[in-house]
Amino acid sequence: MGWIGVDWSSLTGFSTWIIAFLTVTLALLGKVELFVMHYQHSRKGNHMIKINHLTITQNKDLRDLVADLSMTIQDGEKVAIIGEEGNGKSTLLKTLMGDALPDFTVRGDIQSDHQSLAYIPQKLPEELKNRTLHDYFFLDSIDLDYSILYRLAEELHFDSDRFASDQKIGSLSGGESLKIQLIHELAKPFEILFLDEPSNDLDLETVDWLKSQIRKIRQTVIFISHDEDFLSETADTIVHLRLVKHRKKAETLVEHLDYDSYSDQRKANFIKQSQQAANDKRAYDKTMEKHRRVKQNVETALRATKDSTAGRLLAKKMKNVLSQEKRIEKAAQSMTKKPLEEEEIRLFFSDIQPLPTSKVLIQLEKENLSIDDRVLAQELQLTVRGQEKIGIIGPNGIGKSTLLAKLQQLLNDKKEISLGYMPQDYQQKLQLDLSPIAYLSKTGEKEELQKIQSHLASLNFSYPEMQHQIRSLSGGQQGKLLLLDLVLRKPNFLLLDEPTRNFSPTSQPQIRKLFATYPGGIITVSHDRRFLKEVCTSIYRLTENGLEVVDLEDLYS
């Protein structure tokens, strides 16, 4: 008996009716087996991941990043790993994938019967940068389902003719390179999907598409994200990696809750525990104050008495007082402790000399945006003034970063402008072989170094992390370095390319506040709805036909 696979969603109108009629007729006659094709690959049985007492220690500092993690991940769960920058999220993800990690010691047990996985890393792997699209999709991959591949390309508005091109993956925009990885990995047979910051470089429409895919697929998804909206709409289990006590103690929390419920529960528990700790402390202080008065009275009476019989009675009473003191101290050990919280980052601009509000810095009049001979957008019109905060959105590959580079060239020619720039690819500015202190230092003087260390500490860098090579830091920590560099340089105009892309939910509000209160002008490319709404005074969508004004409320429609 043969079989026919039908992707019903790709057919329309009369052709759908004809093929459906013929297929069902043949099936009834016993000539074919009929099945409906879904994006999900078929699997047999239930698959679980059992984690028992998993601890991951960084060898360089002998510091735990994951502490005694035990949990069972059921088939189909959507597990989000969250935590501050540098807390070990990517390390945990790679450990669950079975990767070898020579810089870490892993203790504990991970049991999994999964046979196939798909993985999209936080950064485009070096080995892919020089691969052509043709080789990636047709030579390197033998297990792709091409019906799914082309369907995904259509959904993501990626021209499938480009699959056969000789364009190198490294030449794609950040969003496009992430799109082709999504298409490639989701077209493979897999039982578990691992994603490391999947929404970082995607345009708003594609982020919404990815949310929907994660909710729909039957396979297990384990992912890292700093995007609170993304977390709220996808995760049903939270693994929270925390480093408390000045980043010296690891705490690993697991809750089988959606992100909003988890956040609400944590806030409620924090308030409840804080109140109980305060009540216990007041009761303890009151008991101890009463005890100290009794003890002081007995001591005074002992010193004053000259009667031996009274002295013996007082000595016996003092013995009882001291025994009671030990009981109080022992009981104090079971008092509710004040909850430990990771410290929020503290960073702000000072002594900025902004340009006049009305000063026109850039005037684009019907200009084209091009790369080599290829026109990305035409009829560009834009006026930029001294203290405006302009957000630019648009689909992946439309040329937003190219536009930012064009504006950077124009602003660099203005003598009155002190320009600060934060690229999407941090390595464009960072010197990876230097330590954070060495990178930020300009004079090497003691006073400057102390100031830098103080600033780094306010961004939750531990002292050892200040001494490590920048290449060993997480993406979020590298982003913090660029932010601090901007603050120390005191520019009066900023160009930002996806400035919030690697920062944790705890840091995000502080970063939005940092730029919202910045007195100078800003032009930023961003896909972060909250950032755009809280920071920008005007927003434009870049299209092939120019820049369109966007209403802030339309970002949520």
State where each predicted segment sits.
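Coupling and communication elements adjacent to P-loop NTPase active sites across diverse families
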Residues: G45-Q58, L144-Q167, Q265-D373
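Conserved beta-strand
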Residues: I51-L54, D61-E77, G108, L364-R385
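Pre-Walker A (P-loop) beta-loop-beta motif of ABC nucleotide-binding domains
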Residues: D68-I82, Q115, R218-Q219, L380-G391, ...
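ABC ATPase nucleotide-binding domain signature region
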Residues: K78-E84, S90-Y146, R242-R247, G386-K451, ...
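ABC-family P-loop ATPase nucleotide-binding domains
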Residues: Q115-S177, K188, Q424-D485, R489-P491
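Hydrophobic anchor residue at the start of the ABC signature
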Residues: L182, L483, I511
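Walker B catalytic motif
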Residues: E197-P198, D203-E205, L495-P499, F503-S507, ...
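Conserved H-loop
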Residues: D227-E233, D528-E534
